[in-house]
Design a protein with these regions (language model features):
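Structured, contiguous alpha/beta core segments that scaffold functional sites
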Residues: 2-270
Length: 270
């Protein structure tokens, strides 16, 4: 069977295509390596019709990076190791009062290391990390904010937090605003940690941004091999039957053959 060339990104990976030939049935999957073509920030913020700066052309670049991390085992392993080595085992200090604080830094009973580890994970994954600080009488609580939910305001003075930018991208009532330090409002402020990146004034970029295609290929190779093992139709011989056969009969024959040759333990059988 002839292998089909890769199609454009307009086709989804799960789509199947059948040829119109009457006596033969061909099926193949199309892979979608949907790497963002350009990762830029708007040069003229006056042209941006929202109060925040979009991150990526579709404002979903952080979501893409998070999904890529879940799909590529190599990428996930590298980022996890960097996070573990950065966060260490624990924070230690001599001051007894400070020692008690770092064991419990917020109302969720998280330690300073718990929060710091999440910040390090976001920093390495997205090139950005956000820590929310909530002041109260006698101290301050520290919280990690999921970087995929945050967009920076045009003014650079606050952030917008949205649990679903894909669904509620234009509904401000679904968002919360938190000022960026040193501004404080309602006893809250956020500290934005980010990588420096030329031409980027609002967001940082992760170190691996130049390797996005290679990371995607790592995932696609694994998916290709897995699909091949499950659905590979490679008998050790080809049997040709002379005579006319209708489309329905041909399809039935293909189905019966696939039951025998497709699946675990059936490769190379005849």
């Amino acid at each position: 069977m002839r292998k089909a060339p890769l199609k454009s990104q307009s086709k989804k990976a799960s789509q199947l295509r059948k040829t119109a030939k009457k006596s033969n049935t061909f099926e193949f999957g199309v892979f979608d390596l949907a790497i963002p073509p350009n990762i830029t920030e708007p040069k003229n913020i006056k042209d941006v019709n929202t109060k925040w700066i979009p991150f990526g052309n579709d404002n979903l670049f952080p979501q893409y990076l998070a999904e890529l991390k879940r799909k590529s085992s190599t990428q996930r392993s590298v980022l996890a190791q960097k996070t573990v080595f950065t966060s260490g085992a624990k924070f230690v200090c001599r001051d007894e009062g400070l020692r008690d604080f770092i064991k419990d830094v917020n109302s969720d009973k998280e330690s300073l290391r718990d929060v710091f580890k999440k910040l390090a994970d976001d920093y390495y994954t997205f090139g950005n990390a956000y820590m929310e600080c909530v002041k109260y009488d006698g101290g301050v609580n520290l919280y990690h904010i999921d970087a995929t939910t945050v967009r920076v305001a045009k003014s650079k003075k606050e952030i917008y937090v949205n649990s679903d930018w894909c669904k509620y991208w234009n509904q401000e009532d679904k968002m919360s605003r938190i000022p960026i330090y040193p501004r404080v409002a309602h006893n809250k402020f956020v500290i934005h940690f980010k990588d420096y990146e030329p031409t980027f004034n609002y967001y940082g970029l992760p170190d691996y941004v130049a390797a996005l295609e290679h990371i995607a290929v790592d995932y696609e190779i694994g998916k290709w091999n897995h699909t091949k093992f499950l659905n590979g139709f490679q008998p050790s011989a080809i049997v040709e039957i002379n005579g006319d056969m209708g489309e329905e009969e041909a399809q039935k024959m293909v189905t019966e053959a696939q039951k025998k040759f497709v699946g675990e333990g059936n490769n190379g059988k005849i």
